[in-house]
Amino acid sequence: MESSAKLSLARLSPRKTRTVADLVRGKGIQQALNTLSFLPNPSAQILLKLLKSAVANAEQKGVNDIDKLFVKTIFVDGGAVLKRFVPRAMGRASKIRKPTSHISVVLSDTKTR
């Protein structure tokens, strides 16, 4: 049985978040939670909360053994980019880009590819 969780418009860079997501892809749920809990990245804390949400969704669906769950798919897509301007010298302005991410996690209890 599969369970999923999604997060839209997270104020994280997709490029930096993908590196953390690659660490837990395909791993067991306990190993993934332990890995994310010891990483100092802000994106690791967001992914940790998202994984816990997916586990809670699995419990609501009636999965009996949570320890058999593993991260089937996890992917990070780019979201809308917030654009801000900063005043510069001689009346100019520079653009500041604040990227956002859409993160999706799917947990499964059977290892079928």
Swiss-Prot record:
One of its GO terms (cellular component) is cytosolic large ribosomal subunit. Signal peptide: none annotated. PROSITE patterns: RIBOSOMAL_L22. One of its GO terms (molecular function) is structural constituent of ribosome. One of its GO terms (biological process) is translation. It comes from the Bacteria. It holds the Pfam family Ribosomal_L22. Coiled coil: none annotated. InterPro entries: Ribosomal_uL22, Ribosomal_uL22_bac/chlpt-type, Ribosomal_uL22_bac/org-type, Ribosomal_uL22_CS, Ribosomal_uL22_sf. Keywords: Ribonucleoprotein, Ribosomal protein, RNA-binding, rRNA-binding. Part of the 50S ribosomal subunit. This protein binds specifically to 23S rRNA; its binding is stimulated by other ribosomal proteins, e.g. L4, L17, and L20. It is important during the early stages of 50S assembly. It makes multiple contacts with different domains of the 23S rRNA in the assembled 50S subunit and ribosome. Belongs to the universal ribosomal protein uL22 family. HAMAP family: Ribosomal_uL22_B. This is Large ribosomal subunit protein uL22. It comes from Trichlorobacter lovleyi (strain ATCC BAA-1151 / DSM 17278 / SZ) (Geobacter lovleyi).
